Amino acid sequence: MLNKIQHRNLNTYSVTPFDFFEEFSRNLFNDFKPNFIKTDIHETDNEYLVEAELPGIPKENIQVTYENGVLTISGQQQIDAVNEDKKGKLIRSERSLTSVQRQYLLENVKEDEIKASYSDGVLKVTLPKDSNKEIKKSISIE
């Protein structure tokens, strides 16, 4: 049994007809888990370090690309669960396919020197900065 926190309006004089819809949407959408990659991005003078959480996704199912200043991380996890009774008769079969993808704008990077590693459900991508590329552009006003 799950315990849920009940949100109630403590001020009885500020009740509006829309409170019902607010409560309904809160109950409806709170049970959905967000399907995105939790990420930390660190920047130093020399590089960017991206740490992305991809728990349960095998290394073989993770793709990392860098194109036009955009780092893209995507992954896919498939779970097949089969339960049989003692006689071997199938009583339940479940499948799940989860896909995640995020993109990050990280310009001024040496594309040939990008490195990635994956351990304990955390993907670490190191993107060395290119000091030869000009970051700021001056635009003249007419």
From Swiss-Prot:
Pfam families: HSP20 (PF00011). Residues 27-142 form the sHSP domain. CDD domains: ACD_LpsHSP_like (cd06471). Gene3D superfamilies: 2.60.40.790. SUPFAM superfamilies: HSP20-like chaperones (SSF49764). Induction: Overexpressed in acid environments. Belongs to the small heat shock protein (HSP20) family. PANTHER family: HEAT-SHOCK PROTEIN 20 FAMILY MEMBER. This is Acid shock protein.
